[in-house]
């Protein structure tokens, strides 16, 4: 996904614009959205509605975490949202160990959630 596509999606989902983010936050959100979209593609063909339903939770968490609006531990009861927030954390420069500690989950769980992004 490119930045313009992500800005439109974030605008449609959350009524936010590019001006609501710093350049760093926007870069993290764009990278996270691209990764989340790739992961959803592995579920096979789906309608736009189905895709939007599956994107909403992880994207909300990625935006909230990237902007510092919510701590990672807030998402531990919802694996999809935790995954979105942790993906944003990786693109913000944090390690898997840092994210696991922040979320209060085991390193093994954080590694499983992050998959190929694990480091």
Q: What is the predicted function of each stretch?
A:
Residues 41-48, 73-76, 80-81:
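Intrinsic-disorder/low-complexity linker and hinge segments
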Residues 77-80, 111-119:
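Short, solvent-exposed alpha-helical "recognition" segments
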Residues 77-94:
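Short, amphipathic alpha-helical "recognition" segments used to contact nucleic acids or chromatin
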Residues 99-100:
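Short alpha-helical "recognition helix" segments of helix-turn-helix
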Residues 108:
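Key DNA-contact positions within bacterial/archaeal DNA-binding proteins
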């Amino acid at each position: 996904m490119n930045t313009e596509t992500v800005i439109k999606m974030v605008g449609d989902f959350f009524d936010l614009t590019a001006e609501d983010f710093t350049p760093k936050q926007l870069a993290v959100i764009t990278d996270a959205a691209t990764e989340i979209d790739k992961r959803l593609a592995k579920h096979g063909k789906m309608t736009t509605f189905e895709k939007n339903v599956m994107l909403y939770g992880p994207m909300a968490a990625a935006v909230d975490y990237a902007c510092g609006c919510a701590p990672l531990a807030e998402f531990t009861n919802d694996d999809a949202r935790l995954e979105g927030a942790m993906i944003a954390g990786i693109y913000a420069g944090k390690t898997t160990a840092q994210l696991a500690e922040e979320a209060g989950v085991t390193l093994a769980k954080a590694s499983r959630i992050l998959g190929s992004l694990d480091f």
